[in-house]
Swiss-Prot record:
GO terms for biological process: DNA replication. DNA polymerase III contains a core (composed of alpha, epsilon and theta chains) that associates with a tau subunit. This core dimerizes to form the PolIII' complex. PolIII' associates with the gamma complex (composed of gamma, delta, delta', psi and chi chains) and with the beta chain to form the complete DNA polymerase III complex. This is DNA polymerase III subunit alpha. NCBIfam families: polc (TIGR00594). GO terms for molecular function: 3'-5' exonuclease activity; DNA-directed DNA polymerase activity; nucleic acid binding. It comes from Staphylococcus aureus (strain COL). It catalyses: DNA(n) + a 2'-deoxyribonucleoside 5'-triphosphate = DNA(n+1) + diphosphate. CDD domains: DnaE_OBF (cd04485), PHP_PolIIIA (cd07431). DNA polymerase III is a complex, multichain enzyme responsible for most of the replicative synthesis in bacteria. This DNA polymerase also exhibits 3' to 5' exonuclease activity. The alpha chain is the DNA polymerase. It comes from the Bacteria. The keyword Cytoplasm applies.
Length: 1065
């Protein structure tokens, strides 16, 4: 047997368990000369199939299984490409099927693409004669060995192969159950799904007509198609007046260079070099295309990032507006982006604000045509955790067992079932019974198979021809996709550009828009000063919550130690704070603060490493060192850098000799050459592209600038981006309060779905209120825009439709203070809800009928709700306090220590808090303990109560009260938590503090005369405490006398002072 003509691979999603590599391996073992891939309706697997076959000297045949219909009957059909034209026909046929979601193919559609195909009808019966007869003039039409005889039609033996061996039949049933969302025991007749890969011995045992087998070879020999890689498929840019792209590009570049206030001669020299490299490689159209779409974005209110990746190292990119990073100013290398000695497609990735990215994609589609632009397919796979749960589900495991499985497989990226099996608890689960062992066996066979398709997050393919001429297409959720992955499409030669959506650009754009609208200030982010000391003070304090690249706890810690003073410090931090180079951070900080400690292996390293204090941080530095010492061109230096990062021993040894020889010819001793090579080899693994670091540091700086100068607008927009996450919202509210920003309750006449900045503070989003959905907010805001602000609560009730105006909505709005601006207490408005809901307040408001038919609404004024209840409702509906936290409300004036004021060094200092969360757990020894979250209204702190303390204080933790806690700080993973040693209710603490006071200090003597009889000149007994007066104006303490704690007037004396005017010691 020399060929298999009907292989269904795992890319026939959930229909086959046969991986391409396994199909090829089996073919090799059986001395098969040719394989045909024939997945149903799709060509997903073509590139991998082609590569695997060629690598193993097997002839690849490209085909597809379809279902052909005449409207009445349907016949399974295999179509095979005879040549490259047939291959293109397959692309288009599959594209037609997938783009139009066709289950069946009409014989008319098949005829359109059949000239260069071999057609094999399967299991043809009498009812299919009409379909077969349509193709009677088609010379390469066959029927399979299970079909009836039809005059003039040859038969061929063809076996649908979709799993490896006979023992793997259960995989097809399992895949069918997963696909159909049913139970495994409901799937029957596995034979209908296909067969295993038959061995030559098994085929010989079958009673097959020899002529049928002969036709297999005939068909295999007729098929001769191949995938063509690295084609020149770049689209051509339409220039004005049909000017050549080269001439037009040069004219645009020189014109732009003359506009800029730069050293013309220096920049022109660099420009000529880059232009020559680009045009010699034939990439002039590419740069013009990218420039055009970025120009569209910038002129259509879509914010574009300053650059991404190595493209910021190109002066051409800078002059075309593709980047806003001057590569000469920042000492960036063009060869890191485009290497003239290693011809590859340039890779320009573009960041757009995420909320408007689709506008640019739509522009590209309109410019080039719908069939000329597509996204890129990606595949989700049955990885360990997913396959374990899927197979458990179809085998009928209950939810408890499924959850047990999930808990037994670690949350580790890329973990395999074999790795999980090394864990004792997982192994015990597998061998608990025969059912579990069968479950594990099926899981192992399905692990790694593609399960579903999705869309690549960023990649867009563009061509000036319909894309199905070069690759098959399918339909995704938001448009067309190539059926091949990003790397496969690029290997063919198609132009791929990454259109990435960056949330931080949306935040910046929104801030700029609001500042211009509200304050009349037009901020040009290209003209802001990049040496603003207030920005560097913010960074030095680590106040970088919400700032791109700088908001993790680890980076904040580094910033506090480093104390950035200039932009280069930000670039360095964003490059160093990654696995690998992190170990150099202490060295960098030490040298940054004391440059005398900088040491260089050789003086010629100083010009290259001076800005980074002798530490190699950037890939460009490695290239510069190779150029300086070994006289490498930057192209050669980039090849060296790539070789070092890939750690290919043979290539590395060759490059080492190349480097040492070059250094020798350049006048360096062999010993120092070897040391320099070893130095750059050490850092090559994690050197960071400086061009990318500069680009992203610019975004970080811009956000820092906006946070410093427009904090209300900054925090409002950061908060708007975390709507829906109660935890993140509470964290950002907490951070904003720490910065002194007033958080205002939702205001029915000011608030939107998003947070609204104002001069007074930030209005909370109406969408933050639990139980108030987006549609309700939309109705409220739309009504306000169309008919003006609401005059009062009853006006609101009249204008909002009944379907929205529910008791639940009204109560929520009232209890968070959304109507406070109308001057009525929340309790008064709660009382008015019945009037609103009982009366018909949605009568048409035009004309006097409204006045006659609408009953007069009256408020029944009530006293305001108690402060504690107001705070409780705000916490319930918003997840945090707005009016005032209980800690703030009553006790900050007494100068208690709070989390916000607590330093890491203040162990065992009593602090005033509420317990936000108490999570009780049981230790391995069966003892109870708890993890808690403490809150003081401004900041939260994680705490832990170990078993001994938990026994003492468990009962207290059930009370919603204010507490004084103390303990010791523990620092892990750069986060602090308090190991709690003691807990007291505030009331108990106050009593004890009063009972044991040794001195009373007052700051206001206005009440003193009322208690003159209590004050004694000298101490007479143990119950007497010192009474002192502290004069703030002269900063002096005076002893007034003594008072007796047992005196009947003592408590009255204490209560007569404002909390801020008295202190007990």
């Amino acid at each position: 047997m020399v060929a298999y003509l009907n292989i269904h691979t795992a890319y026939d999603l959930l229909n086959s368990s046969l991986k391409i590599e396994d199909a090829v391996r089996l073919a090799v073992s059986e001395n098969v000369d040719a394989l045909a891939i024939t997945d149903t309706n799709v060509l997903y697997g073509f590139p991998k199939f082609y590569d695997a076959c060629i690598a193993n000297n097997i002839k690849p045949i490209f085909g597809m299984t379809i279902y052909v219909t005449n409207g009445l009957n349907t016949v399974e059909t295999v179509v095979l490409a005879k040549n490259n034209d047939g291959l293109k026909d397959l692309y288009q046929l599959s594209s037609e099927i997938k783009m139009n979601a066709l289950e069946h193919v009409s014989f008319e559609l098949l005829k359109r693409f059949s000239n260069n195909m071999i057609i094999i009808f399967k299991k043809v019966g009498d009812q299919h004669r009409d379909i077969v007869q349509v193709f009677e003039t088609h010379n390469d039409t066959y029927m399979d060995h299970l079909s009836i005889s039809i005059q003039g039609r040859k038969h061929v033996w063809i076996q649908n192969v979709c799993y490896q061996t006979r023992q793997d039949a259960d995989t097809i049933s399992a895949l069918a159950a997963i696909r159909d969302n049913t139970k495994l025991d409901l799937i029957h007749d596995q034979e209908d799904f296909g067969a295993h890969f038959l061995t030559e011995k098994e085929i010989n045992q079958l009673d097959i007509n020899q002529e049928y087998l002969t036709q297999v070879d005939v068909i295999a020999q007729k098929c001769d198609a191949e995938l063509k890689y690295h084609q020149s498929l770049l689209p051509q840019y339409e220039t004005p007046n049909d000017e050549s792209a080269k001439k037009y590009l040069w004219r645009v570049l020189v014109t732009q260079l003359k506009k800029l206030e730069l050293n013309y001669d220096v920049y022109l020299e660099r420009l000529k070099y880059e232009y020559k490299v680009i045009t010699n490689m034939g990439f002039e159209d590419y740069f013009l295309i990218v420039s055009d779409l970025i120009h569209y974005a910038k002129t259509n209110d879509v914010m574009v990032g300053p650059g991404r990746g190595s493209s910021a190292g190109s002066l051409v990119s800078y002059l075309l507006g593709i980047t806003t990073i001057d590569p000469i100013k920042f000492n960036l290398l063009f060869e890191r982006f485009l290497n003239p000695e290693r011809v590859t497609m340039p890779d320009i990735d573009i960041d757009f604000e995420d909320t408007r990215r689709e506008r640019v994609i739509q522009y590209v589609q309109e410019k080039y045509g719908e069939l000329h632009v597509s996204g890129i397919v990606t595949f989700g796979h049955l990885l360990a955790r997913a396959v374990a749960r899927d197979v458990g589900r179809i085998m009928g495991f209950d939810e408890v067992t499924l959850n047990e499985i999930s808990s037994l497989i670690p949350h580790k990226l890329g973990i395999t079932l074999d790795e999980a099996y090394q864990i004792d608890d997982f192994k015990k689960f597998v061998h608990r019974n025969h059912r579990h062992e069968r479950w594990f066996s099926i899981c192992k066979k399905l692990e790694g198979l593609p399960r579903h398709t999705s869309t690549h997050a960023a990649g867009i393919i563009i061509n000036d021809h319909p894309l199905y001429e070069y690759a098959p297409l399918t339909k995704g959720d938001t448009g067309l996709l190539t059926q091949w992955t990003m790397t496969e499409a690029e290997r063919i030669g198609l132009l791929k550009i990454d259109f990435l959506g960056l949330r931080n650009l949306s935040i910046i754009h929104q801030i700029l828009t609001q500042v211009k609208k509200d304050l009349g200030i037009n901020i040009d982010i290209e003209k802001i000063p990049f040496d603003d000391q207030k920005v560097f003070e913010l960074l030095s304090q680590g106040d970088t919550t919400g700032i791109f690249q700088l908001e993790s706890d680890g980076v904040r810690s580094v910033l506090k130690k480093l104390k950035p003073e200039h932009f280069e410090d930000i670039v360095a931090v964003t490059s160093l704070y990654r696995p690998g180079p992190m170990e150099e951070i202490p060295t960098y900080i030490t040298r940054r603060h004391d440059p005398s400690k900088v040491q260089y292996l050789h003086p010629h390293l100083e010009p290259i490493l001076k800005n980074t204090y002798g530490v190699i941080i950037y890939q460009e530095q490695i290239m510069q060192i190779a150029s300086t010492f070994a006289n490498f061109s930057y192209g050669e230096a980039d090849i060296l850098r790539r070789a070092m990062s890939k750690k290919n021993r043979a290539v590395l040894e060759s490059e080492r000799q190349h480097f040492i020889e070059g250094a020798k010819q350049n006048g360096y001793h062999e010993d120092i050459s070897k040391q320099i090579f070893d130095l750059i080899l050490k850092f090559a693994d994690y050197g960071f592209p400086r061009a990318h670091a500069v680009s992203y540091s610019k975004i970080a700086y811009i956000m820092s600038f906006l946070k410093v100068h427009y904090p209300n607008y900054f925090y409002a927009n950061i908060l708007s981006n975390v709507i829906g996450s109660e935890k993140k919202t509470a964290q950002m509210i907490e951070e904003a309060k720490k910065q002194g920003i007033t958080i205002l309750p939702p205001n029915i006449n000011e608030s939107h779905w998003f947070y609204k900045p104002s001069q007074e503070g930030i209005y909370l989003s109406i969408g933050t209120i639990k139980g108030v959905g987006y549609q309700s907010v939309k109705v409220i805001v739309d009504e306000r825009y169309q008919n003006g602000k609401f005059k009062d609560f009853f006006d609101f009730a009249r204008r909002i439709p009944k379907r929205v105006k529910t008791r639940k909505l009204l109560e929520a709005l009232i209890l968070v203070g959304a109507f406070d601006a109308f001057g009525k207490t929340r309790s008064t408005l709660l009382q008015a809800i019945d009037q609103v809901l009982d009366g018909d307040l949605n009568i048409e408001q035009d004309g006097f009928l409204f006045d006659i038919l609408t009953p007069k609404q009256m408020y029944e004024d009530k006293e305001e709700l108690p402060d504690a209840l107001i705070s409780q409702y705000e916490k319930e509906y918003l997840g945090f306090y707005v009016s005032q936290h209980p800690v703030d409300k009553k006790f900050v004036a007494k100068q208690y220590l709070t989390i916000f004021k607590l330093s890491n060094a203040q162990n065992y200092k009593p602090i005033l808090v509420q317990f936000d969360k108490v999570k009780q757990i049981r230790t391995k020894n069966g003892q109870n303990m708890a993890f808690v979250t403490l809150n003081d209204g401004i900041e939260t702190l994680d705490g832990v109560i170990f078993p001994n303390q938990f026994k003492k204080y468990e009962e207290l933790l059930s009370h919603n009260d204010l507490f004084i806690v103390s303990g010791k700080f523990d620092h892990r993973k750069q986060q602090r938590q308090l190991i709690i040693n003691e807990i007291q209710t505030l009331a108990t603490f106050e009593e004890q503090k009063l009972a044991f006071a040794k001195q009373i200090i007052i700051r206001n003597k206005s009440q003193i005369d009322m208690f003159e009889e209590m004050i004694k000149a000298t101490k007479e007994n143990a119950n007497d405490v010192v009474l002192s007066f502290y004069d703030e104006t002269i900063k002096q303490m005076t002893t007034l006398g003594y008072i007796n704690q047992k005196d009947s007037m003592f408590n009255n004396f204490i209560q007569s002072f404002n909390p801020s005017d008295i202190r007990l010691i």
